[in-house]
């Protein structure tokens, strides 16, 4: 039996509340305040699935939110000192930072928590009228009869490990939109489906990936 699903309609649905998805929603709202925009975030809260900290160059943020310094942003700690080292088996060798390409020099940048930046960007987006739904993972792409993307479906809830519906089962929603933006990150499963379905990687160099580790340090507040 086909599951009956509730549906919602938007001008734009964005999959993923990372920096790209949040910045997209803010720019769209700045350009056209009447747009009806929602963001789906699989994490329990915005920032929950952000991998790491960040040495942050503010140029893009300066363009997006020029007065970010006056809006209680979490961007506070400037880079005060940096070293570039070549590591050997027993020793390291320092290289003068002024000889490095400008893209590798961080003296004007900030050290931030990327998760905190995303949370702050989320408040800026919501202040503009963007709707953000944490805890809702987009699990399926919805196509029309002409193979055009017309939205996404969120995951069903209340399913046991064997795949059976529990008493608490709730079907996912169909989120329809005129434009669907996929900002899941480098290996999002919906993004991979789109790439495969429409041969977007044809003639392109294969993507390269690195392994990331997330380590959380708790530091007394008086030390930062």
Predicted segments with their positions:
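Short, flexible hinge/linker loops that cap or flank conserved catalytic cores
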Residues: 4-6, 174
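N-terminal Rossmann-like FAD-binding beta1-loop-alpha1 element of flavoenzymes
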Residues: 10-38
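Conserved Rossmann-like nucleotide-cofactor binding loop
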Residues: 20, 45, 187
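N-terminal FAD cofactor-binding segment of flavoenzymes
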Residues: 42-90
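Short, solvent-exposed loop/turn and secondary-structure capping segments
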Residues: 49-51, 96-97, 192-195
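Short beta-strand to alpha-helix junction loop
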Residues: 103-123, 133
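Predominantly flavin-linked oxidoreductase catalytic cores and closely associated redox partners
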Residues: 115, 124-224
């Amino acid at each position: 039996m086909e599951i009956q699903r509730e549906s919602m309609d938007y001008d734009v649905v964005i999959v993923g509340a990372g920096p790209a998805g949040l910045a997209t929603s803010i720019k769209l709202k700045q350009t056209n305040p009447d747009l009806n925009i929602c963001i789906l975030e699989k994490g329990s809260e915005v920032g929950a699935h952000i991998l790491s900290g960040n040495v942050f160059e503010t140029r893009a943020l300066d363009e997006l939110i020029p007065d970010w310094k006056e809006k209680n942003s979490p961007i506070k700690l400037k880079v005060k000192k940096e070293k570039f080292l070549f590591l050997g088996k027993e020793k390291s060798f320092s290289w003068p930072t002024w000889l490095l390409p400008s893209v590798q020099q961080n003296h004007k940048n900030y050290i931030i928590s990327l998760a905190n930046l995303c949370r702050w960007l989320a408040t800026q987006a919501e202040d503009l009228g963007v709707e953000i739904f944490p805890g809702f993972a987009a699990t399926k792409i919805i196509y029309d009869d002409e193979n055009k993307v017309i939205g996404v479906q969120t995951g069903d809830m209340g399913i046991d490990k064997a795949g059976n519906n529990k008493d608490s089962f709730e079907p996912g929603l169909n989120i329809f939109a005129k434009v669907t933006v996929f900002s899941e990150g480098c290996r999002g499963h919906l993004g991979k489906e789109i790439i495969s379905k429409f041969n977007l990687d044809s003639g392109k160099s294969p993507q390269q990936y690195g392994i990331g580790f997330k380590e959380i340090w708790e530091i007394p507040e008086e030390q930062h």
